[in-house]
Amino acid sequence: MTYFPEEVVEHIFSFLPAQRDRNTVSLVCKVWYEIERLSRRGVFVGNCYAVRAGRVAARFPNVRALTVKGKPHFADFNLVPPDWGGYAGPWIEAAARGCHGLEELRMKRMVVSDESLELLARSFPRFRALVLISCEGFSTDGLAAVASHCKLLRELDLQENEVEDRGPRWLSCFPDSCTSLVSLNFACIKGEVNAGSLERLVSRSPNLRSLRLNRSVSVDTLAKILLRTPNLEDLGTGNLTDDFQTESYFKLTSALEKCKMLRSLSGFWDASPVCLSFIYPLCAQLTGLNLSYAPTLDASDLTKMISRCVKLQRLWVLDCISDKGLQVVASSCKDLQELRVFPSDFYVAGYSAVTEEGLVAVSLGCPKLNSLLYFCHQMTNAALVTVAKNCPNFTRFRLCILEPGKPDVVTSQPLDEGFGAIVRECKGLQRLSISGLLTDKVFMYIGKYAKQLEMLSIAFAGDSDKGMMHVMNGCKNLRKLEIRDSPFGDAALLGNFARYETMRSLWMSSCNVTLKGCQVLASKMPMLNVEVINERDGSNEMEENHGDLPKVEKLYVYRTTAGARDDAPNFVKIL
């Protein structure tokens, strides 16, 4: 065998950015393992309990970018108890001890303390990017520490976090020498910000390309900021209220006209329909538009704006857009690739804001559509069959019918054939969420056709264990399976042990799994953590009642090299 110099091998490895590929080459021999671990610059950890933080830091001491995910995805729907875990502290502490060159940290669904942010800010002299998504546990004091000490910060991105507001001081903690910001997003912070500090910060950030403001930022402040950021590409507006002064909006219009590079808009907090006309001149150049925080706008307001966005590729909107509004999307946005329609708070029984008609219209008019999240109150098989034929390039298809177990609204039949068409026609489908009245037949279709599927979400579906077994046996690339309120039990859980060797995780809540079944799984698969979650009182009542084979309230199963975690609360039992 011919051996290349280590420098040559490392150079070859640099052409393998995908973590999966690098993991593979590290298994070839000890020499390659050493070269790969010392040259790895980016590490992704999909489950913070799958491996110990110290082990990651020891293996990859030269890592520059670290991504860690915490709580299961169903935490977004309040199905994971608040104190379940997902703590960022051990990861930041391990990195501070062993990865001194860390420059970027991204965390999702994790509990991040102010103390951890303080440690982060003081430990990495070349730290450049902090991205926190759906995290909690920290306050603006932690952000103040990051602003004060991370003097090379390029990106501070706070998305959908629960942040305790302790005043507007944090924004003034960026030193005068901080001129490196490229992206700043604090839209999720609920408190006031210091307008003067914000204006000064953006004024000395010539490379700023993305800025997303919270609802406390006034129109007048927004106009002043935009005059200082003519190269902005992504803007999250502040508060566009009905109580406005015309002079401020004219200033805003003048400032927006100078933003020739702007391609994405979001925000529109408490937006007044009157203010939208000031945005119209920008619409023709937009490729991204997020109107999901604008409940004050009705279908007419939305369509007047969207009809002008002829280059739009990504649209997030509330269901108040209506089917007619989606027809406007279909006729105007021919390049649309991603559509998300979220439920609004206002709903009248018997009235559906968006239905199968709007979805079919978009599929007909937007042939490039490949990613969908669609909340609605009704659907038909015929519509789903049409959508599948019109848009066979879906990689993500998430349909959420808000009334559990609702059948085809026309035929009253299960929606098996509709979802069957989706998995049959969309060969590259990687993520799927299904809902409505569904039998085991739909899972037979999924197991047979969804060969590229990596994540499947199931709610209120299926007849028997056979449904889940179709998926476990057929979907060879499945990484994450999450199920709620479905009749799958021990036979499905224990039907294919080998599948757990390649899956990242399984979540089951309000199903028919018993404690005995969980114990069998844990004994057969020692590389798994089998977590039984009993929120009711944290007692061991399930263990004490073996005779009736009590059902498990919630089950979380995941592969791990770390063994049982040591921070589990008393309502979590790790078998």
From Swiss-Prot:
GO molecular function: auxin binding; inositol hexakisphosphate binding
Domain F-box: 1-45
Subcellular location: Nucleus
Main location: nucleus
Keyword Hydrolase recorded: no
InterPro entries for the chain: COI1_F-box, F-box-like_dom_sf, F-box_dom, Leu-rich_rpt, Leu-rich_rpt_Cys-con_subtyp, LRR_dom_sf, Transp_inhibit
Pathway recorded for this protein: Protein modification; protein ubiquitination
PANTHER family from the UniProt entry: F-BOX/TPR REPEAT PROTEIN POF3, PROTEIN AUXIN SIGNALING F-BOX 3
Extra facts: The myo-inositol hexakisphosphate acts as a structural cofactor.
Free-text comment on this protein's domains from its UniProt entry: The F-box is necessary for the interaction with SKP1.
Name listed for the protein in its UniProt record: Transport inhibitor response 1-like protein Os04g0395600
